[in-house]
């Protein structure tokens, strides 16, 4: 079947009332960004639907795949746009039925948004079903469990006919909910947390703490790859890589071993807080999960949060670990996250970290060195990368260059 349009159904933005225009415009911008590099289409965003007009050479499968990854889209259907005459609609229904297997069953489903159309829903269903049965003697009607369903939408401008409904990602268009800073460690949880807030329309930039030589270049490239996977859905994402070695070594030198984990995360939060204000973000996001590890008890979260007045969002707070793993597999980050390259959260891990840190004690331990100067130095030396869906690490670039030189 050669389709001439894609019908894009909106997600929750249909509930946004007077703000709907803002949401539709943002979604249209996101669609155009996602489809960059492809041609043969025109995007037309309307109040209740988006239509993508396709030229003959358009790559409909690739366009549909990219659309399915965009937040704010409920579903996509390849459709035929048909004139509002019974002859044209019947001919299109027969065209659909030509693809059906022998002895298969079908039904006609009609939705009539144009109430001025001369035939009501049931009349049109009977007319089209009759036309198909008259043309083919090896298929039959089954309205309860059909093998095929020809869907007909009677709109004001035309008739749209389709069979397939491709699920979208739902949620709200990214860019309608403000900006946040995602603390991206390289583990399983934080990329999922980032995806969860983006699904609510929030834009993210990411911050990663890198402690060479204790953390490797492979750990850094792993985080770049996780950011690239997130960028496939929303376009370019800025990744801020913090040189954290000096701070981390000092914490492990002067803070009691049981409190190093708490203090290290307080330092991370202080750095993130400064960056939040620099980039104009409204909140910090992390992948913390209540009770999962020593630093993620309520007592620990209280001690760590105390260093910032910026809201800290924890989308995964009450998830089971298995739920998080399932989500990471769904979004395509799991295999990268489990690569065995240590990040700064796993090095210097004490054998017996405190789970209910005494707030006064951690403040006392930190008072013996000038961490503020070190934090400022770390912020000043942040490396910022803009990661796109086709971003290649330095290693990949060098490999490609060697291959090209060899050829």
Curated annotation (Swiss-Prot):
<dbReference type="GO" id="GO:0005524">
    <property type="term" value="F:ATP binding"/>
</dbReference>
<feature type="binding site">
    <location>
        <begin position="183"/>
        <end position="184"/>
    </location>
    <ligand>
        <name>ATP</name>
    </ligand>
</feature>
<feature type="binding site">
    <location>
        <position position="296"/>
    </location>
    <ligand>
        <name>ATP</name>
    </ligand>
</feature>
<keyword id="KW-0784">Thiamine biosynthesis</keyword>
<dbReference type="InterPro" id="IPR004114">
    <property type="entry name" value="THUMP_dom"/>
</dbReference>
<keyword id="KW-0547">Nucleotide-binding</keyword>
<comment type="similarity">
    <text>Belongs to the ThiI family.</text>
</comment>
<keyword id="KW-0808">Transferase</keyword>
<comment type="function">
    <text>Catalyzes the ATP-dependent transfer of a sulfur to tRNA to produce 4-thiouridine in position 8 of tRNAs, which functions as a near-UV photosensor. Also catalyzes the transfer of sulfur to the sulfur carrier protein ThiS, forming ThiS-thiocarboxylate. This is a step in the synthesis of thiazole, in the thiamine biosynthesis pathway. The sulfur is donated as persulfide by IscS.</text>
</comment>
<dbReference type="Pfam" id="PF22025">
    <property type="entry name" value="ThiI_fer"/>
</dbReference>
<keyword id="KW-0694">RNA-binding</keyword>
<feature type="binding site">
    <location>
        <position position="287"/>
    </location>
    <ligand>
        <name>ATP</name>
    </ligand>
</feature>
<dbReference type="GO" id="GO:0004810">
    <property type="term" value="F:CCA tRNA nucleotidyltransferase activity"/>
</dbReference>
<keyword id="KW-0820">tRNA-binding</keyword>
<dbReference type="GO" id="GO:0052837">
    <property type="term" value="P:thiazole biosynthetic process"/>
</dbReference>
<keyword id="KW-0963">Cytoplasm</keyword>
<feature type="binding site">
    <location>
        <position position="265"/>
    </location>
    <ligand>
        <name>ATP</name>
    </ligand>
</feature>
<dbReference type="Pfam" id="PF02568">
    <property type="entry name" value="ThiI"/>
</dbReference>
<dbReference type="GO" id="GO:0140741">
    <property type="term" value="F:tRNA-uracil-4 sulfurtransferase activity"/>
</dbReference>
<keyword id="KW-0067">ATP-binding</keyword>
<dbReference type="GO" id="GO:0002937">
    <property type="term" value="P:tRNA 4-thiouridine biosynthesis"/>
</dbReference>
<dbReference type="InterPro" id="IPR050102">
    <property type="entry name" value="tRNA_sulfurtransferase_ThiI"/>
</dbReference>
<dbReference type="InterPro" id="IPR054173">
    <property type="entry name" value="ThiI_fer"/>
</dbReference>
<dbReference type="GO" id="GO:0000049">
    <property type="term" value="F:tRNA binding"/>
</dbReference>
<feature type="domain" description="THUMP">
    <location>
        <begin position="61"/>
        <end position="165"/>
    </location>
</feature>
<dbReference type="GO" id="GO:0005829">
    <property type="term" value="C:cytosol"/>
</dbReference>
<dbReference type="InterPro" id="IPR020536">
    <property type="entry name" value="ThiI_AANH"/>
</dbReference>
<protein>
    <recommendedName>
        <fullName>Probable tRNA sulfurtransferase</fullName>
        <ecNumber>2.8.1.4</ecNumber>
    </recommendedName>
</protein>
<dbReference type="InterPro" id="IPR049962">
    <property type="entry name" value="THUMP_ThiI"/>
</dbReference>
<feature type="binding site">
    <location>
        <begin position="208"/>
        <end position="209"/>
    </location>
    <ligand>
        <name>ATP</name>
    </ligand>
</feature>
<dbReference type="GO" id="GO:0009228">
    <property type="term" value="P:thiamine biosynthetic process"/>
</dbReference>
<dbReference type="Pfam" id="PF02926">
    <property type="entry name" value="THUMP"/>
</dbReference>
<dbReference type="InterPro" id="IPR049961">
    <property type="entry name" value="ThiI_N"/>
</dbReference>
<dbReference type="InterPro" id="IPR003720">
    <property type="entry name" value="tRNA_STrfase"/>
</dbReference>
<dbReference type="GO" id="GO:0009229">
    <property type="term" value="P:thiamine diphosphate biosynthetic process"/>
</dbReference>
<comment type="pathway">
    <text>Cofactor biosynthesis; thiamine diphosphate biosynthesis.</text>
</comment>
<dbReference type="InterPro" id="IPR014729">
    <property type="entry name" value="Rossmann-like_a/b/a_fold"/>
</dbReference>
